[in-house]
């Protein structure tokens, strides 16, 4: 019968929604990734900004090794808390240098070793300050243990030194070369003005003792270039340079002066600064300069 056959199949339309959904998910994931990357970059930048440089970390490590590990530093710090003035005395050279396997005697001349003379004078200065009662002196080295200049500076800094005096003797192959010079913190350092004031006191005192003053007044700035070559500027040259000076002077955290008392290779200089009597006279000169520097009598 007409019209009784199987009705025609209804057309079915299928809407494919899966592909747009996947696209939206992908875009969302990319956006989230970009956001996370941005946040990570900001955090990394901030961390790098607060992270110490290799040099800063090395200095911090030196201070950590010096601070709190030695009874002397603890004792000096305690005395400083009681109002005493901390003065660091640095005897140049001394001790066996493990890098070369031999003792760091410093310069040799006139039958003397620089390390012996500087330790003798430094110890005499220490004793005078200790007897005074207003000071808490410390030696950055004892002559038996080798300590790098950075470690010596770290010891002084850890003890809260308010002044550092580093004692040395000069050397020249020509025995006719002579004279006194001292080297304060350089103009680019915040400790320059006070270091220069102390250096001028010391130079004037040694000049009065009969020492020839090198340069214009016995006070000179010493710098080291990128190749570690030393060069000199006189004390009236206030040019701010980026090159470093002596490590013990630059890193101790207080006004500091490195003294080259005279030439160990010159007989006249040795007579004035390196004999037993001369070491006592030099120590007294330093003591008097320290009193003047701190306005004490």
Q: Which functions belong to the PLM regions below?
A:
Residues 78, 84-111:
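Short glycine-rich His-centered loop
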Residues 82-96, 178, 253-261:
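Short coil-to-beta-strand
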Residues 5-11, 27-83, 91:
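Boundary/activation segment at the start of structured domains
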Residues 5-7, 20, 40-42, 51, ...:
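Compositionally biased, intrinsically disordered low-complexity regions
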Residues 1-24:
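N-terminal Lys/Arg-rich, disordered targeting/topogenic segments
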């Amino acid at each position: 019968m007409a019209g009784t056959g199987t009705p025609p199949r209804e057309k079915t339309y299928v809407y494919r929604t899966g592909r747009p959904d996947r696209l939206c998910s992908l875009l969302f994931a990319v956006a989230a990734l970009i956001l996370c990357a941005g946040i990570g970059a900001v955090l990394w930048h901030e961390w790098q900004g607060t992270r110490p440089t290799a040099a800063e970390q090395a200095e911090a490590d030196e201070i950590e090794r010096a601070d709190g590990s030695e009874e002397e530093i603890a004792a000096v710090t305690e005395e400083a808390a009681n109002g005493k003035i901390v003065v660091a005395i640095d005897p140049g050279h001394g001790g066996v240098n493990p890098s070369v396997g031999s003792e760091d005697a410093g310069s040799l001349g006139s039958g003397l070793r620089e390390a012996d003379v500087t330790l003798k004078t430094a110890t005499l200065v220490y004793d005078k300050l200790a007897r005074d009662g207003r000071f808490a002196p410390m030696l950055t080295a004892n002559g038996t243990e080798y300590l790098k200049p950075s470690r010596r500076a770290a010891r002084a800094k850890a003890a809260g030194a308010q002044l550092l005096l580093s004692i040395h003797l000069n050397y020249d192959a020509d025995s006719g070369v002579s004279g006194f010079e001292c080297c304060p913190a350089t103009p680019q350092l915040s400790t320059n003005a006070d270091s220069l004031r102390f250096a001028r006191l010391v130079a004037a005192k040694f000049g009065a003792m009969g020492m020839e003053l090198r340069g214009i007044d016995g006070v000179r700035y010493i710098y080291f270039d990128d190749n570690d070559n030393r060069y000199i500027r006189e004390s009236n040259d206030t040019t701010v340079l980026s090159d470093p000076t002596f490590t013990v002077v630059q890193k101790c955290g207080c006004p500091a002066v490195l003294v080259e008392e005279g030439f160990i290779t010159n007989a006249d200089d040795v007579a004035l600064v390196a004999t037993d009597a001369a070491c006592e006279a030099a120590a007294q000169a330093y003591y008097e300069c320290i009193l003047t520097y701190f306005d004490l009598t």
